Structures are given as structure tokens and as C-alpha cells.
């Protein structure tokens, strides 16, 4: 689903703005993101998450492009991970609490 949506909307718009890119390049990029590495997060492999030296705040979701399981696995792997509650955006009353958690996390992990 995310691959198809990106190929139909994001890819063509990006190629229009960037003449150095082609739809073939977009296809290869999206295939690597959404197909080849589909069992985990698309930006990094598990060993990178496991070795991540910086604090990470994981806010689980349950959508086709942000499935719950990889979020939880990321939080379990990252040595300095914090995890927000889930679901955090199903009602508008929960969003301020999630925002407060993000602000607290950022303040606590601000570089000196």
C-alpha cells in the first residue's frame, strides 16, 4: 500500500522537482524501503538500532506504513529507548499527554 501510494503520488512529484531523479530510481528506493526490508523499519537494520548510542522515543502506531510490531521491537532493541503509551492518537484527549511526553523526552535529552 505505501509503495503503491508513493509510486502514484510522492514519486512523480519528486521527479518533477528533481530532474536528476527518474521513476526507476524511485522504484528501486521504494522497493528497498517497503519490500526488501519489509519485516522491520525501512531506514536502518536491527543491528544499527541495537547499537544506537542516543536516546530514542518510540511512539507506536498501527497503520499500514507504521505497524505496531516493528515499533515495539525497535523499543526493545534500542538501548536508550523510551516508549509512549498506545494508542496515543485515537482520541483528541490523549494527544496532549503524548505531546507532553515528547516535550519531556526532548528536554531530558537536550545536549548540554
Where on the chain are the PLM-derived regions?
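Catalytic active-site module of serine/aspartate enzymes centered on a nucleophile-bearing elbow/loop
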Residues: 79-112
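Alpha/beta-hydrolase-fold enzymes
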Residues: 1-8
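Conserved alpha/beta-hydrolase "acid-adjacent" motif
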Residues: 64-70
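Short beta-strand/loop motif that positions the catalytic acidic residue
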Residues: 51-52, 58-60
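Acidic beta-to-alpha connecting loop that harbors the catalytic carboxylate
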Residues: 61-64, 88-90
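Active-site phosphate/pyrophosphate- and oxyanion-stabilizing loops and adjacent acidic/basic residues
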Residues: 46, 72
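Short, conserved loop/helix-junction motifs that constitute active-site signature segments
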Residues: 49-53, 76-78
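Hydrophobic, aromatic-rich cap/lid helix
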Residues: 8-9, 16-45
Amino acid at each position: 500500500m505505501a509503495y503503491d501510494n508513493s509510486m502514484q503520488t510522492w514519486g512523480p512529484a519528486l521527479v518533477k522537482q528533481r530532474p536528476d531523479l527518474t521513476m526507476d530510481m524511485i522504484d528501486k528506493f521504494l522497493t528497498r524501503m517497503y519490500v526488501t526490508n519489509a519485516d522491520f523499519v525501512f531506514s536502518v537494520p536491527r543491528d544499527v538500532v541495537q547499537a544506537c548510542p542516543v536516546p530514542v522515543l518510540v511512539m507506536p502506531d498501527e497503520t499500514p506504513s507504521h505497524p505496531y510490531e516493528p515499533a515495539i521491537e525497535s523499543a526493545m532493541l534500542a538501548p536508550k529507548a523510551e516508549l509512549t503509551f498506545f494508542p496515543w492518537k485515537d482520541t483528541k484527549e490523549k494527544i496532549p499527554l503524548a505531546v507532553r511526553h515528547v516535550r519531556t523526552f526532548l528536554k531530558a535529552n537536550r545536549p548540554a
